[in-house]
């Protein structure tokens, strides 16, 4: 039995479907006891969402589950693991990316510079980590952020992505180049050299990319940096660029292309292969993903 007391919070029921889907993908067994939307359980952990919106998490694995999944992905707050988190109101640049885990579509890195008088305006708009927002809301907020703040977006479409990847041979190095390029452009626009980045690799990777561009930056890298308002705004712009790019590719080939790299992605990829051929398939995907081998039937060969 867990020595920790149950973790209890209130969840917006609009997030119930996402939570349920995520838990199923994580291997939880689902039941529907009375007065609940569902109860999900696996070894060492139970997560129950009641029809009132009350969410109860208990079990010996609850701390890891809450800190690394529930807070960043669902609650978008860090009271359990970071109870003293405060909003940084110092003018600074925030950087985030979208598309690195998606087989189809572009890789997008965005940066947003926020001045002191803009924080309250962004808060009032409801700016927060894009992972908690619908595509419709992301597009609405992206337009408002662009009207309010200085920003820069590096959008690398699949064909260019594959070409650049051949040079870097490593996704983290490619991402670091994209981050450094975005930072460089926003420094030129704003004159601000204080930057917060959602950390995706060893800190040295981004520092080296900045050094190559001869950039002197007051850089903070941290995991789950989307709790910072500038990074959250950047995550929205990066996501908007990604979903727009994916939608455009879907229109071009007349096949809906899913996000991620799931079985649905493989199914869509095989349809593209049948309709358009291997060359066209390669032009709209990230070729180093193992998903491509699965689509082409090369797994285990």
From Swiss-Prot:
Pfam family, one: RNase_HII
Enzyme Commission designation: 3.1.26.4
Localization of this protein: Cytoplasm
Record keyword Magnesium present: yes
Residues that, per the record, bind a divalent metal cation: 96-97, 198
Gene Ontology molecular functions: magnesium ion binding; RNA binding; RNA-DNA hybrid ribonuclease activity
Domain RNase H type-2: 90-301
Cofactor binding note from Swiss-Prot or TrEMBL: Manganese or magnesium. Binds 1 divalent metal ion per monomer in the absence of substrate. May bind a second metal ion after substrate binding.
Family: Belongs to the RNase HII family. RnhC subfamily.
Protein name listed in UniProt: Ribonuclease HIII
Annotated gene: rnhC
């Amino acid at each position: 039995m867990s020595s920790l007391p149950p973790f209890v919070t209130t969840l917006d029921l609009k997030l119930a479907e996402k939570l349920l889907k995520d838990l199923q993908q994580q291997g939880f067994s689902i039941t529907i006891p009375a007065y609940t939307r569902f109860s999900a359980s696996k070894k060492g952990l139970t997560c129950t969402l009641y029809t009132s919106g009350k969410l109860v998490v208990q079990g010996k694995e609850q701390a890891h589950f809450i800190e690394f999944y529930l807070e960043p992905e669902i609650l978008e707050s860090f009271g359990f693991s970071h109870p003293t988190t405060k909003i940084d109101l110092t003018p600074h640049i925030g950087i985030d990316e979208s598309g690195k885990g998606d087989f189809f579509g572009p890789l997008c890195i965005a940066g947003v510079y926020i001045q002191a008088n803009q924080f309250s305006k962004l808060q009032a708009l409801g700016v927060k980590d894009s992972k908690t927002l619908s595509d419709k809301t992301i597009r609405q907020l992206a337009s408002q952020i662009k009207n309010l703040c200085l920003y820069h977006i590096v959008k690398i479409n699949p064909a260019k992505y594959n070409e650049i990847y051949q040079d870097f041979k490593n996704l983290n190095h490619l991402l670091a180049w994209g981050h450094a390029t975005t930072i460089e452009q926003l420094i030129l626009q704003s004159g601000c050299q204080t930057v917060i980045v959602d950390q995706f690799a060893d800190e040295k990777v981004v520092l080296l990319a900045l050094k190559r561009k001869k950039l002197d930056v007051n850089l903070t890298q941290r995991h789950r940096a989307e709790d910072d308002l500038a990074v959250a705004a950047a995550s929205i712009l990066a996501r908007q660029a990604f979903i727009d790019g994916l939608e455009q590719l879907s229109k071009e080939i007349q096949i809906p292309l899913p996000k991620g790299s799931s079985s649905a992605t493989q199914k869509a990829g095989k349809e593209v292969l049948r309709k358009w051929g291997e060359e066209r398939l390669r032009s709209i995907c990230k070729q180093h993903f193992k998903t491509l081998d699965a689509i082409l039937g090369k797994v285990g060969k």
